[in-house]
């Protein structure tokens, strides 16, 4: 049985309407989830974390038919960030919509994940 490496946090900056947003994607082993936090640059505004629990991530990943585990789901997010296929589509006072573009079998499909309450 091989030991899976513990995923490292992903840090990135996404520009949306000429404002830079700092993105932090973290794997939380104890809570068995991946958290995504978005903070606006040069601002005291701290957006709530998007909490994606294990089951939601597995369901999400099954849409892509790429993985069955939390670690694989994290890898999908990591690849999306590194390939710049993630963008902030809409930000309001209490919601953030993350725009994901994933290429499957040469066809580009677009998915939206809506955040917390």
Give the residues covered by each predicted segment:
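A structural signal for beta-rich interaction modules in eukaryotic proteins
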Residues: 1-114
């Amino acid at each position: 049985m091989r030991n899976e490496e513990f995923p490292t946090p992903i840090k990135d900056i996404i520009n949306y309407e000429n404002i830079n947003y700092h993105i932090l994607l973290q794997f939380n082993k104890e809570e068995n989830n991946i958290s995504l936090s978005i903070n606006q640059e040069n601002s005291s505004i701290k957006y709530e974390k998007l909490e994606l629990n294990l089951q939601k991530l597995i369901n999400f990943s099954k849409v892509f038919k790429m993985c069955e585990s939390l670690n694989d789901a994290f890898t999908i997010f990591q690849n999306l960030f590194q390939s710049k296929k993630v963008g902030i589509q809409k930000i309001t006072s209490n919601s953030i919509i993350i725009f994901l573009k994933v290429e499957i079998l040469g066809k580009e499909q677009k998915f939206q994940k809506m955040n917390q309450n």
